Amino acid sequence: IALQSPAGAARIRDYLYNELSK
């Protein structure tokens, strides 16, 4: 996943959000 790409950043953000929301 490329951090510089909007889609990649959104995917990582959503993943981290889900992990932290557990």
Swiss-Prot record:
One of its GO terms (molecular function) is serine-type endopeptidase activity. Keywords: Hydrolase, Protease, Serine protease. One of its GO terms (biological process) is proteolysis. Its EC number is 3.4.21.92. It catalyses: Hydrolysis of proteins to small peptides in the presence of ATP and magnesium. alpha-casein is the usual test substrate. In the absence of ATP, only oligopeptides shorter than five residues are hydrolyzed (such as succinyl-Leu-Tyr-|-NHMec, and Leu-Tyr-Leu-|-Tyr-Trp, in which cleavage of the -Tyr-|-Leu- and -Tyr-|-Trp bonds also occurs). Belongs to the peptidase S14 family. Cleaves peptides in various proteins in a process that requires ATP hydrolysis. Has a chymotrypsin-like activity. Plays a major role in the degradation of misfolded proteins. Component of the chloroplastic Clp protease core complex. This is Probable ATP-dependent Clp protease proteolytic subunit.
